[in-house]
């Protein structure tokens, strides 16, 4: 009892570890928590290099999503279109009802008359082709801005009130005369004729492009020119080159088109032609074969000849009347200038006369070069033999010779034109020319 505490216990009353018991574990800090959502790096090695990559159908899903979005857009557009149609349907029905009311007020049939004088916004004096003049009213739905003295109007069949305006439309024949597409021929396609090109530029092109030059020098530009010469010398070709080089409206008409069947239609067509040219100014009016209507006036024995003379008188009036032509230039062409009426050729109407002679040696050489530039010629071809010939060639004859020589080469299945082909072509063209033209016609 008197013994002290046992040596096996420590100060706190715990038993000291014996040598045979395990020692306590050392304190180790807890491992940090793994990061969520972070992709762990894969160990690189020989196994990773040999492993195939994982492929997911992400591209197909994106394409399908894009397709569905596009379909949705189309469906939304269709829905909006259907909604607009339903909303506009009552308005269309109302507009149709208003149109039917206007038709009932106009009545059928309607008379055609002329507006003589506009009294006020609601009343006017009108006349018909047969009968006296009337003081009538103007219905409220008529466009007052288009009413002007002299215009054609529609009148009620019974009360003769103004119910509409008859629009003055362009004659279909005149609309056909307008050259919509510029010709492909240019001044570079014309062999020679340098003096003629210079004259027509001064008389036709320069007044339209630079009118201030004529004002500064104090002269009036020419109103028109006439191109005359033997057939095939390049008159129509030069007119096409003018149409190609200028931006003005080009109206082309053949003289025979101005001769109409019924009385008064020819002068009316001439007036309509120049009215359209004035509306579309700056413009150029080209009348080919003017000798069809511009021949010398004699005592006419038939109604047809008198109608041709009336057409020519209207043409004279349009060329040099009280109304100034302004930016409208006239080009006439003929190969029989001696048969034209002197009144048509006097200065003031046609201020410049341009002659087209047969080509000389220099011009022939240039024309042959133009027409053979795209042809495949053999080495034995000598064009100087045809240039220096004494036969009278026109530009059209030279073109016909080149074309005929090419056809002869094609007939023999050859891709090159030889000198013999040109000789045969020349003989053929000259034979047809001498056979087809009456002797002494162009002397």
From Swiss-Prot:
Residue ranges of the region described as Disordered: 1-55, 87-108
Location relative to the cell: Cytoplasm; Nucleus
GO CC field: cytosol; mitochondrion; nucleus; proteasome complex
Single annotated GO MF: ATP binding
A Pfam family that the UniProt record links to this protein: AAA
Tissue expression: Preferentially expressed in the root and shoot apical meristem.
Database matches in InterPro entries: 26S_Proteasome_ATPase, AAA+_ATPase, AAA_lid_3, ATPase_AAA_core, ATPase_AAA_CS, NA-bd_OB-fold, P-loop_NTPase, Prot_ATP_ID_OB_2nd
Annotated ATP binding sites: 229-236
Description of the deletion phenotype: No visible phenotype under normal growth conditions. The double mutants rpt2a and rpt2b are blocked in both male and female gametogenesis.
Location, primary (coarse class): cytoplasm
Gene3D superfamilies the UniProt entry points to: 1.10.8.60, Nucleic acid-binding proteins, P-loop containing nucleotide triphosphate hydrolases
PANTHER family tied to this protein: 26S PROTEASOME REGULATORY SUBUNIT
Family (UniProt): Belongs to the AAA ATPase family.
Record note on quaternary structure: Component of the 19S regulatory particle (RP/PA700) base subcomplex of the 26S proteasome. The 26S proteasome is composed of a core protease (CP), known as the 20S proteasome, capped at one or both ends by the 19S regulatory particle (RP/PA700). The RP/PA700 complex is composed of at least 17 different subunits in two subcomplexes, the base and the lid, which form the portions proximal and distal to the 20S proteolytic core, respectively.
Protein name stated in the entry: 26S proteasome regulatory subunit 4 homolog B
